[in-house]
Amino acid sequence: RVVTMKFLLSLSCCAVLAGVRMACFGADAMSSEYRELWGPSVQAEIDARIEKHRKADAVVAGFKPGTAVEVEQLTHDFKFGAHIFNFDQLGSREANDAYKATFTNLLNAATVAYYWSSYEPVKGRFRHAAGPHDTAAFWDGVAALSAEEKYNRYVEYRRPAPDPILDFCAANGIDAHGHAMIYRVSQPDWVTNAAPTDAEQIGLYRAHIRELAEHVGTRVSQWDVVNESVRRDAPVDAPDDTVFWGDPSRHVPAGYTLACYDEAAKCLPKGVGAAINEACVIDDVYLAFVKSLMDRGAKIDIVGLQFHIFNAEEMVGLAKGAHKGRRGYCYTPARIKATLEKADRLGRPSHISEITVPAPEETPWGEAVQAEALRDLYRLWFSWPSVYRITYWNLVDFTYHKESLASGFYGRDMRKKAVYHVLDRLINHDWKTRLSLKSSPDGSVSFRGFRGTYRVRGIGADGQPCEKSLNVR
């Protein structure tokens, strides 16, 4: 009878999940092939991992026996984030307020822009504090320009001065991640034009890392020390960073990645993590490169894994259950699990560091495809024990300067899309613990909840109302 009841309960849970998916996304959002890829067995595995790895047991004592106790989770240990590059740049007070509220109502982490060419456009002149082009009033005045026009005209577009953003994060309990100390794409012209020797160029990199570490200190919890440096066409058994994948014509000193981690290890404050970040995470050469760096002494604390889909057609293929996209792969559960398993061999926590999953079109169907895809992806990533942080990239549609993609949680008019509501359901409801319990004869309550901070309220042993704070780890 127990087995039968468990079986019926399992069927009931699957039916509820199917009903939720149908209600949220509609019957025709995804193909039967997609639903087979992400079917009940995959969802059950995800649920089991979430229960095992994202929850912990807790006991709270000191209540009057046999009385009601309310357990309420306040914060998550797990970091849910996005980049905050459009801070005060969205053209109206209402839009800017909605953008900021995302980081207080939905998310608890932010990636802060430190692109060298905009941070130090002239040698020695750092854009720490807000300037004339960092005010909401300025961006309100150019709101009619396209994202591409803003990017081409203003070095500050999607690159706001970081100090005010760090202040915003600190005031609102938002964990800040610095992106990035060294990134060849954002190398300032004054570095490139100086045409230094390799040794001199690496010296400039080291000095820049020192400046950032000293000025920012512990206001960020971690840095992408080097971003996207592996040479993609290098053999897996001999990975290197001699040519940047996006611009092979620009010189880069051989071995600069290792030198940068050497410098970061010397100057980053205690407790600030050194991350590496890369786009070609499905390719074996990236993880081979990270292992090579670590074998040569690089102190890499965090492995960043990007998952971008910069193509509407690829999203259509994903909805159809495709196993291959335009880059030779598609984000199927099996492929993602294989990538995470390979990353785990490095023995470091993984940061799902940049995510772009667009709606293939600006229609209810397109938004439903985006929402269901991200629901499945977030659930898989959240369930994986080595993943501790998930960062979405562009929160608002059509704010990325190179691609016309409806990839945000908000439409261009700051309307909350289906994906916002789906992730809000996961983060603020499904993955938050709220319980009504009764204290045991010894005055304690026991429960299993998601890791984070809690408020526990009831009647104390002295008969008076009491409130206790708790960290469930």
Summary of predicted features, one role per range:
Residues 92-106, 446-453:
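Short Pro-Gly-centered beta-turn/loop motif in secreted/extracellular proteins
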Residues 111-125, 140-274:
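Substrate-binding cleft and catalytic face of glycoside hydrolase catalytic domains
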Residues 80-82, 107-112, 176-180, 221-225, ...:
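Hydrophobic faces of well-ordered beta-strands that scaffold small-molecule active sites
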Residues 27-89, 109, 121-122, 129, ...:
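Beta-strand-rich domain onsets/edges
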Residues 86-88, 116, 182-184, 227-231, ...:
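Active-site-proximal loop/turn and secondary-structure-junction residues that shape catalytic pockets
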Residues 122, 156-171, 175, 243-277, ...:
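Glycoside hydrolase catalytic-domain groove-lining segments
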Residues 10-21:
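Bacterial N-terminal signal peptides
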Residues 35, 215, 224, 229-256, ...:
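Aromatic-rich peripheral "rim/lid" segments of glycoside hydrolase catalytic domains that contact
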